[in-house]
Amino acid sequence: MKEIAVVILNWNGIELLKKFIPNTVNYSKEANIYVIDNFSSDGSVEFLKTNHPNINVIELDKNYGFAEGYNRGLKNVNEEIYCLLNSDIEVTENWLEPIIKEFNNINTSIAQPIILDYNNKEKFEYAGAAGGFIDKYGYPFCRGRVLNSIENNINQYKDSKIFWAT
């Protein structure tokens, strides 16, 4: 089995960490968990070090924003697979198993679970839905969402190829 890292970028997100990190820790036993801290001033780093000493905290020297923050932090992560997880995501039991299984296929370079709306678990999440595609004109679109219309999840997009992940 390949080594996997769950990597979360944080900036002043202590309340999100308090709410969502416990499930991430409990349901990610097969992974090493990292939090890249983008120079928070809200006590996030202290909270993690005190309450979750098994989480690897990578402290950046300033707020580099989303992409550069991840890129700088990932230089300190040595696992073979990176699972980039937003700090406001609630993971569920066994969430990593299908992702790990998919990465055992040498032709897989990216994978995304179906992302459901936090407040309405029957619907896809607006921004990520179920992965995405590029149409023939070069426009990106999500499976599970057409403009502002969000579909219910009835497993219609289970195990299908995607062009991009969120």
Language model region names:
Residues 139-142, 147-166:
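A recurrent flexible, glycine/aromatic-enriched loop bordering the glycosyltransferase active site
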Residues 30-39, 58-60:
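Short beta-strand/loop segment that forms part of the nucleotide-sugar
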Residues 3-5, 32:
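Cell-envelope/extracellular polymer assembly enzymes that use nucleotide-activated donors
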Residues 60-77, 87:
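Glycine-rich, basic loop-to-helix element that forms the pyrophosphate-binding segment
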Residues 23-31:
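Short, acidic, metal-binding catalytic loop of nucleotide-sugar glycosyltransferases
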Residues 90-139:
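Conserved donor NDP-sugar-binding/catalytic core segment of glycosyltransferases
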Residues 82:
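Short aromatic/hydrophobic "clamp" motif used to bind/position activated sugar donors
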Residues 14, 23, 37-46, 62:
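A conserved acidic beta->alpha catalytic loop
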